Design a protein with these regions (language model features):
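Active-site and adjacent substrate-binding regions of carbohydrate-active enzymes
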Residues: 1-593
Length: 593
């Protein structure tokens, strides 16, 4: 790692930005050391398995009750052992923490309880040494109201930051824009007593939206990108990107101006940092989200990846209804994406299980099935972890994970789901799904040596999901544990490139309770065919599949290498146990050992 260069001014760059004569001065990347960079690979994200980890929740190396960057470094060997290719870190920037770090006070400073910029560079370097990439959230739409840009904007409307935010003398503009946080916000406008104007916010009132109609704001955010990319980060999940611009008589989402700015960001990446990645967080319908990949004729010139939000709730819906059609229909509605693009798919993350992209009837059904206790609801979603959502049913957990790893897109795991961690529904907001990682049955779940009262949140002590019974140490030693099963499935997926970059063909079949599809890769010397069959019913189910296209091929089960009867002209009959699944590799006669 390069030695850190000395800052010529009498100011420690680790202290972040500062205000001098009404101007906010930011540190430079050359003030810090830089991490080693992995070999350039412009398509690594298409084959990667992502793992979302909250820095605060993973491991506390400083024994102050909160996880930190040094603690994450200590656990990189576990993540390498598990089979993770890329870490996704939610915001670790300096913040008043009124919204879990998504209210950023300084883009150029690490939250002190997490560490320093040098600690982050050390994390990047240690991860890259193990072949693990790291991306983080960049909240582009808004800042905290304690950010110096906002403080200068409200104090001095005629100063350099006076137009950094969206101000108005009235709260009636952009009336067609929906309110996102309906539980807490009555309006997208809030009156500021200092400037005596209203400011615009799509999220909480303490998160004013930046004014992207101001070119200075666009360049300021590009500078933030460059700062962290220079240090060695592998990419960004761009948070809340549909809302960057506002226009009257629109819903202020997915506007052409937003796409133009993202093209500018992508050009910076391609020209200056090839191999780095932009991942769009756009909770929209597939036809709208696909626009965030950019021009298909160029292979994509906006974001490299985008989350497929509507797919996730329909996986839950399909299994509870014991019908493949919720999944089949949303995949059929998903347009093709550019060649250099990839979906990101997930089951759970640090937010609620969002139900924005379902109909009112479907939302009521999901609440009735998965959130019987009113405390389980949050905003327009359900604040529960995967294992409790599935009633801790190992067969369901395995089925859901198998679909996550085999449907089109790069899978994103959420920390703790690999061991079946539970939630604490009596904690406020979404904290119930953000509790400490459960490493051992020892005090504080092995997460921290601090006194229990110092912990940022209590570890789960539930009789079923508590750390005394659900922890990494116990499961790592058990060959039949969920942890070792997950590790095995990640290894199987890595051996079969069709899961990552193969085509997708749904097979239909005689039984609507069974979802069957083929992932096939045949290019650049790689030939791989994966047949996936998923029983969405709790009861055993038969299925007849038309596999004539692969006549003469032999299905070989991927985990045990068991050969099934060769495929012929007749429908291929399989019987699956309740919530069971098969992963087959289809082998031509000349490929069989």
């Amino acid at each position: 790692m390069d030695a850190a260069r000395q800052n010529p001014v009498d100011h420690d760059p680790a202290e972040g930005s500062r205000v001098e004569d009404g101007v906010v001065e930011h540190p430079n990347a050359d003030d810090f050391g830089h991490a080693r960079v992995l070999p350039e690979d412009r398509t690594w994200f298409k084959r990667a398995v992502f793992y979302e980890v909250l820095v605060r929740a993973f491991y506390d190396a400083s024994a102050d009750g909160s996880g930190d960057l040094r603690g994450l470094i200590e656990k990189l060997d576990y993540l390498k052992w598990l089979g993770v290719d890329c870490l996704w870190l939610p915001p670790f920037y300096d913040s008043p923490l009124r919204d879990g770090g998504y209210d950023i006070r300084d883009f150029y400073k690490v939250l002190p309880e997490f560490g320093t910029v040098d600690d982050f560079v050390a994390l990047l370097d240690a991860a890259h040494r193990r072949g693990i990439r790291v991306i983080t959230d960049l909240v582009m739409n808004h800042t905290s109201d304690s950010h110096e840009w906002f403080q200068e904007s409200r104090r001095n409307p005629d100063g350099p930051y006076g137009d950094y935010y969206v101000w108005s003398d009235t709260s009636q503009k952009y009336a067609d824009a929906r309110i996102i946080f309906v539980d807490t916000e009555e309006s997208n406008w809030t009156f500021d007593p200092v400037r005596k104007q209203f400011y615009w916010h799509r999220f909480f009132s303490h998160q004013p939206d930046l004014n992207y109609d101001n070119p200075a704001v666009q360049e300021a955010m590009i500078d933030v990108l460059r700062f962290w990319l220079d240090l060695g980060i592998d990419g960004f999940r761009l948070d809340a990107v549909p809302y960057l611009f506002e226009r009257e008589n629109t819903n202020c989402e997915n506007l052409p101006e937003t796409h133009a700015f993202l093209k500018h960001c992508r050009k910076v990446i391609d020209d200056e940092y090839p191999g780095r990645v932009l991942l769009a967080e756009a909770n929209q319908w597939p036809a709208d989200v696909v626009e965030y990949f950019g021009d298909p004729d160029t292979g994509g010139d906006e974001c490299h990846m985008a989350f497929h939000f509507p797919l996730m709730p329909r996986i839950f819906m399909a299994v509870r209804r014991e019908s493949r059609f919720p999944i089949s229909e949303i995949l059929a509605q998903t347009p093709p994406i550019p060649e250099m693009a990839q979906w990101g798919i997930f089951l759970r993350n640090h937010d609620e299980l969002t139900l924005e992209m379902v109909t009112d009837e479907e939302r009521d059904y999901m609440y009735a099935e998965y959130a019987k206790d009113p405390r389980m609801k949050a905003n327009v979603g359900i604040r529960r972890r995967l294992a409790p959502l599935l009633e801790n049913d190992r067969n369901q957990i395995e089925l859901f994970t198998a679909m996550l790893l085999s449907l089109p897109g790069s899978p994103v795991l959420y920390y703790g789901d690999e061991i079946g961690m539970g939630d604490i529904i009596w904690l406020g907001d979404r904290d119930g799904v953000r509790t400490p990682m459960q490493w051992t049955p020892d005090r504080n779940a092995g997460f921290s040596k601090a006194n229990p009262g110092q912990l940022y949140l209590p570890p789960n002590q539930d009789p079923i999901y508590g750390y005394q019974s659900v922890n990494v140490e116990a499961q790592r030693d058990s060959s039949s544990s969920l942890l070792n099963w997950t590790r095995t499935m990640l290894a199987v997926r890595r051996r079969h490139a069709a899961f990552a970059i193969g085509t997708f063909r749904e097979l239909g079949g005689s039984n609507p309770s069974v979802l069957a599809y083929v992932r096939e890769l045949d290019r650049d010397g790689e030939h791989d065919i994966a047949l996936c069959v998923n029983n969405l019913s709790r009861f055993p189910q038969p299925i007849e599949l038309n596999l004539q296209h692969w006549n003469g091929y032999t299905p070989v089960e991927m985990t045990g290498y068991v050969e099934f009867p060769p495929i012929g002209q007749l429908p291929y009959l399989l019987t699956l146990p309740g919530h069971g699944f098969y992963w087959f590799s289809l082998k031509a006669s000349e490929e069989k050992p």
